[in-house]
């Protein structure tokens, strides 16, 4: 009676295929880990805080002109006359809640398709400009999948910046910089005269962030 057996070459083939599969899995895992680490680094930078400067436009919309890492999140709004003020936490949360309602009913420009029509030229309101900035990743994090996984948001968020250069500066800043302590001191000084028509803040954080920027 013949005994069942396998040729050595059969095991060699199986072993070779197993090795190829393992190499493929390790390679894919390595690429995924690299992307995960890169995204994690950027997310951690944003989560630590962002100093954002929004500028009012002639159509009463708002654009991000500068933003960079800070140990705490602050949002400065500059009106058409050049006056600046720092938004309070209560005011920011109110704006975000209002924008969240628009996101839920589909009227927020952040989640609408970018058709290039009149809807695009009318610009973004203050709430949508905040959520489109780096600070939106912190302040609007609880909105979650309503916003950040929306493909229209990914495109529209870039349009909340005044120029491609402003957007690129932000990306570079959050990719390789650490939170700046000077941003906190500057923001605290900017809170004086919050509800008044204060002149542009003279804090280093604001002035250094906008130096040489064409407004």
From Swiss-Prot:
Is Signal found in the keyword set?
yes
Keyword Acetylation among record annotations: no
> Where found in the cell?
Cell membrane
In terms of InterPro entries, this protein maps to: UPF0323
Q: Where is the composition biased (Polar residues)?
A: 158-181
Alphabetical GO CC annotations of the entry are: plasma membrane
Membrane topology per the entry is: Lipid-anchor
Q: Which keywords fit this entry according to its UniProt record? A: Cell membrane, Lipoprotein, Membrane, Palmitate, Signal
- Spell out where lipidation (S-diacylglycerol cysteine) occurs: 28
| Region forming the signal peptide | 1-27
Primary site of residence: membrane
**Residue stretches of biased makeup (Low complexity):** 197-208
- Note the lipidated residues of kind N-palmitoyl cysteine: 28
Name the segments for region: Disordered. 158-215
Checking NCBIfam families in the record gives: PRK04081.1 (NF003146)
Per the similarity annotation, which family is this?
Belongs to the UPF0323 family.
Q: What is this protein called?
A: UPF0323 lipoprotein Hac_0309
Naturally occurring in which organism (per UniProt): Helicobacter acinonychis (strain Sheeba)
């Amino acid at each position: 009676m013949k005994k069942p057996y396998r040729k050595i070459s059969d095991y060699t083939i199986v072993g070779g295929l197993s090795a190829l599969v393992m190499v493929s899995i390790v390679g894919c895992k390595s690429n995924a880990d690299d992307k995960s680490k890169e995204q994690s680094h950027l997310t951690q930078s944003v989560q630590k805080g962002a100093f954002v400067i929004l500028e009012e436009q002639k159509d009463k919309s708002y654009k991000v002109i500068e933003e960079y890492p800070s140990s705490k999140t602050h949002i400065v709004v500059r009106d058409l006359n050049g006056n600046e003020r720092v938004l309070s936490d209560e005011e920011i949360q109110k704006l975000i809640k209002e924008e969240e309602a628009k996101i839920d009913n589909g009227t927020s420009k952040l989640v609408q398709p970018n058709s290039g029509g009149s809807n695009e030229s009318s610009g973004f309101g203050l709430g949508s400009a905040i959520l489109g900035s780096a600070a939106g990743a912190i302040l609007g994090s609880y909105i979650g999948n309503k916003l950040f996984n929306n493909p229209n948001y990914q495109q529209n968020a870039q349009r909340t910046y005044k120029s491609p250069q402003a957007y690129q500066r932000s990306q570079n800043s959050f990719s390789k910089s650490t939170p700046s302590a000077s941003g906190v001191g500057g923001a605290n000084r900017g809170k004086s005269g919050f509800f008044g028509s204060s002149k542009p803040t003279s804090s280093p954080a604001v002035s250094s962030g906008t130096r040489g920027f064409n407004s």
